[in-house]
Structure formats: C-alpha cells, structure tokens
Amino acid sequence: YANVDGFDAEAAQVPFEKCPEIDRWILSSLNTLIKGVDRELAGYDPTRAGRLIDAFVNDDLSNWYVRLNRKRFWGKEMSEDKLSAYQTLYTCLMTVAKLLAPFAPFYADELYHDLGGELESVHLDKFPVADEAAIDADLEERMAIAQKITSMVLALRRKVNIKVRQPLQQIMIPAVDDVQKAHIEAVAGLLKNEVNVKEVNFIEGQGILVKKVKCNFRVMGKKFGKLMKGVAAQMSALDQDQIAAFEKAGNITLNIDGQEAVVEVADVEIISEDIPGWLVSNEGNLTVALEVELTPELKKEGMARELINRIQNLRKETGLEITDRINVTVAPNEETDAAIKAFADYIKGQVLADSIEIGDNAGVETEFDDFKLNILV
C-alpha cells in the first residue's frame, strides 16, 4: 500500500496531538519499549531486552496495531489520517530496526535499508532514546485491557467453534471498580469491531454470573502448610459478594484456628459457571460473558461476511490489483441469497464491487461450510 500511495517518509509529520488515539497508543508503547530495552541492557540482561522487543513486534505492532488499521491504508487519497498511520508505522519499524541491531545485526541492517535509512549501516546510527512526553500509561492500560478481553472472547468463540466472521449479539462484563469500567467504556467501540459483537454491556454486581474459587494446591500447599485444609474450606465457602470483594482487593485474610492466612488472587483460579446461551471466561480480576445464541439476522450477516471472504480470495487468485473494481454473480442458494438481499451494499463496499447479482454462472466453484456454489468475478 505504501508503494502504491507513494508514501514519503520525509514528508512533514502529522502533529502528535492530531494523531488518532491508536497511533498515540503504539507510539507510547514504543517509547515504553525503548525505556525497557535500555534498562535491561544497562542491567546486563539482553535476554529480557530481546523478549521485550519480540512482545512489542508480535503482540502490539503486528497482531494489534497493523491489524486494526488496515482499512486506514485503503483510502484513495493521502488524507491526514492515512499519513498519520503510515508515519506511525514507519517510526515503529525504524525504531525496532535500531533496537534490534545488537541482537540481529544483519536483519536489523536489512530492515534499516529497506526503510530508507540515511547512514551506511544501522550500526552507525544513534540508539533510540525514549520520548517521555509521548508515554501515556493510562492509554496503555486501556489498550492492554482491550487486548486481554479480545483474547478471552476469541478463546470462547473457539470453544464452541464460532468463527470471528460470525457476528454475535453482546458481551457482558461485571467491572470490579469504576476505573476498570471507564477503561472498558473507552475501548468499547474497538472491542465490538475486534471480536465482532453488537454490544458491550456491564453487569451490576455479578448479575447472572455464578463464580467459584478453585485453590491451586501445588502453590498454596507450600505457602500454608498445615493450614491448607482450613484455607481451602473457607475459600470454597465464599459467597458471590465475598468473591467480588476478593477480586477487587487482590487478596483476602482468613482466620484459621487463630492464625492469619493471606490468600492472593494469584494463588487461586476463579471460575464462572456457564449459563444457557452464554459462555464465561475469567482471567485475573476480569470476567467476560459472551452471548452465543444466533438470531436469523445474525446468521445472515455472518453469511455475508463469509461471502466477502470468498470473493476476496477469488480477487487474489485472479491476480486483480487492490484498486480494481469488479462485478460479482453468485449462484442461487437459500443462505447466500438471504445474505445478499440483506447486506448487498455492505458486501459491495468490502470487495470493491460495482454490482452483485444472484444467478447461474460459469464462475469458480467455491466451498462454504455446508455447501458449494459458483461465484463469478
């Protein structure tokens, strides 16, 4: 996309305060990374420094930032938003090339030159220095919560074999405090897009959720010794309000035969019982309930997304350029017919089609989960 758009890395930078929040987040994370790598190298721990770079590139840059921003690169003109996305990605990659230099000298040099590095070698350039003004710890915390919830919901989808392309109605979250709730509300729109749900709602208290505490005997046995039996009995007897308070505080103090025993959240596993039509996941002090029942309308939209996926694959297979417009004909089928009639404009917009019609054709036989049909592009 950058080559097609003629991106110029030397163009005037979009002011930091005008960058979208997602750009400011990755730049904040980048500068936090620089500080972390510098700290670990100064402490003679290159292994931890390398792992920080690996986590940033894989978890934050590739699997989150680039994936969330693909549509920003699709616009026909070089808008300020699009330029900000390119410049942000370029800054991240160039900085990573410099951070990588001590760990992967040859690859770092190749990446540096691919990005148009000014000097003969990355090893002659200055090592990155963190910009403290660009670091926003609150923003990083919000995005970390979004990443965590996304991971939990996607795991629940896999549990019942529901693809991400199939929209679901809602997730419900019992926030442990106002701070966590505010963080989640701030990223609700992003969450809806990323896990493909219509709504992100909050439960007052535990609502419909029933939680249980499961002790980790391997860890707790060493910690509490002879008190372990009493600790396990009291932990399993906690009611829903006590469990909620335990999650919020991060620990609970028990009295076992006149002796105090402090149990940390990390010592136990808090599990939630699944309820009809829902799946529930817990991780630390975060609980997410996913509604998995499918309405006819949700099924139609899911099929529309499946159709988009097949048409996009056909575009690639036929060697079309990313900017080429197409016309599409789909063979008659009850499921795809309903999806096309309900979501024709959406499908056309996603695959750059001027038209989409239902009719017999001599196109490519295309496989869906339960049937095959011809699609002509």
Give names to the regions the model predicted:
Residues 1-377:
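Feature 926 captures the class I aminoacyl-tRNA synthetase adenylation module centered on the KMSKS loop
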